[in-house]
From Swiss-Prot:
The gene is marc-3. Disruption phenotype: RNAi-mediated knockdown results in delayed degradation of the maternal plasma membrane protein cav-1. Coiled coil: none annotated. Residues 267-289, 327-349 are annotated as: Disordered. InterPro entries: Znf_RING, Znf_RING-CH, Znf_RING/FYVE/PHD. This is E3 ubiquitin-protein ligase marc-3. It is found in: Cell membrane; Endosome membrane. Residues 273-282 have a biased composition (Basic and acidic residues). Zn(2+) 1 binds at residues 13, 16, 48, 51. It is a multi-pass membrane protein. GO terms for molecular function: ubiquitin-protein transferase activity; zinc ion binding. Pfam families: RINGv. It comes from the Eukaryota. The chain crosses the membrane at residues 98-118, 157-177.
């Protein structure tokens, strides 16, 4: 039955009509993930966070114009550098240009300084004259009273002029600063930065391409990484997420190569996130402590992903891991074409695989297993709804041909190269 809720095209942002890896993100990342913060379904509900925030800032709205959903918004005020850089003083004709006022202040500053300096010097000169007349008052019958009165008046006049010039200059500067500060506050109130809070959690948000590697990092991250290397703890690995797109390939933008990275978190034996019929999934992946040690994982590649339809999909949080474990589960399938020295290998070792969590608004989880070029290949059943391709640069190595399916097809390194398997988690793990 046709699913009318499924999108027929690739996942793109509703505003810029571009995919996840089509635009640079914060100047460092390969692309920006798509989020679904409103109730619109399909690609109509997908946004780049930066595009949505820019649109809400320009339109001064907080609701979706289609579903009328009220976005959860957090606002942040812009600084004065943004005000100057974006030309906020040009929004109204009544606003004065701060650069012109600043140039005018710089122009009159030397004149004001010279006027105050000369006034103070005149007051000091009059004070010295008064002091000389006062010291020689006995030589004059009037006690140099006329000279003393004149110098006192001159000193007071010079001090008044100096104070007047200084007050006028300070008043001019303060008034200019207050005017531009008021202009800036009005612009700041009308041009706040809006941060959209995604209504869905990390699992329910739709991420359509593999997670990219985090670039750089601050000094805290570097110290934590160095301390982790000293204690020999595994570094954090980002979870690759593969989207459901109803058998429509997601073509990445030319020139951008997403990186498939494995997640190495351990699942507990009593967790509902594991297959209870397969205890080997809970084993610790000895010898595989970091993503860099995994074969054919964390290599730049160009993925073409075909996801599974919504059939028997179950909800489970991110943290599921198809661990890089060495299982010794006895295989009951027949083996053929095996050399005599390897004929005793009935306990097949599981291949290294990545557990990928995917959901469309919390509707499903899929397991993704990537074959490794070694002597123990895991067979991939050719099914149009459960088989995906992943072009990788695995080195060519000789491998023993093993037949693990009933179709009689021979599984070789060439036939299994660059493929990964998408499995649906059944509901029987709760039983």
């Amino acid at each position: 039955m046709e699913d009318f809720n499924a999108s027929l095209g690739p996942a793109v942002c509703r505003i810029c009509m571009c995919g996840e890896t089509s635009i640079p993100y914060l100047g460092q990342q390969a692309g920006e993930p798509l989020i679904s913060p409103c109730k619109c379904s399909g690609t109509m509900g997908l946004f780049h966070r930066s595009c949505l925030e820019h649109w809400l800032t320009l339109t001064s709205t907080t609701n979706c114009e289609i579903c009328k959903f009220a976005f959860k918004i957090k606002q942040k005020s812009r600084n004065f550098i943004d005000y100057i850089r974006q030309g906020g003083y040009k929004k109204l004709q009544s606003n004065r240009n701060p650069f012109i006022d600043f140039a005018f202040v710089l122009l009159i500053l030397p004149f004001a300084f010279f006027g105050v300096f000369m006034s103070v010097e005149g007051a000091l000169y009059a004070g010295r004259k008064y002091h000389y007349a006062f010291e020689n008052r006995d030589n004059d019958e009037n006690g140099n009273l006329e000279v003393r009165n004149q110098t006192s008046l001159e000193c007071a006049l010079f001090l008044f002029v100096a104070l007047l010039l200084f007050s006028a200059f300070i008043t001019l500067v303060v008034s200019a600063l207050w005017h531009h500060f008021r202009q800036y506050k009005i612009w700041q109130a009308k041009n706040k930065i809006m941060f959209v809070v995604d209504q869905l959690d990390a699992e329910q948000s739709m991420h359509f391409n593999p997670q990219w590697k985090k670039q750089g990092g601050g000094w805290k991250e570097k110290i934590a990484k160095f301390w982790g290397e000293i204690r020999r703890r595994p570094t954090r690995a980002y979870i690759p997420e593969i989207a459901r797109n109803d058998s429509i390939p997601i073509e990445p933008v030319v020139g951008i190569s997403p990186v498939l990275v494995a997640n190495f978190n351990r699942t507990s034996p009593d967790s509902n996130n594991t297959h209870h019929h397969d205890e080997s999934r809970n084993e610790i992946p000895f010898g595989r402590r970091t993503p860099e040690q995994a074969i054919c994982v964390s290599m730049s590649s160009t993925p073409q992903m075909y996801a599974e339809k919504l059939e028997k999909l179950t909800l489970s949080p991110i943290g599921l891991d198809d661990l890089f474990a060495n299982s010794r589960a006895t295989s009951t399938r027949r083996e053929s074409g095996i050399s005599p020295e390897s004929s005793s290998r009935r306990d097949m070792r599981k291949t290294h695989s990545v557990y990928s969590v995917c959901s469309s608004f919390g509707t499903g989880v899929m397991s993704c297993s990537t074959p490794v070029a070694d002597n123990n290949l895991r067979t991939l059943t050719p099914s149009p709804i459960s088989l995906s391709t992943f072009k990788s640069g695995c080195p060519t190595e000789p491998v023993v041909a093993i037949n693990l399916n009933d179709s009689g097809d021979t599984v070789t390194i060439d036939s299994q190269r660059g493929r990964f398997h998408v499995e649906t988690l059944e509901n029987d793990y709760n039983s």
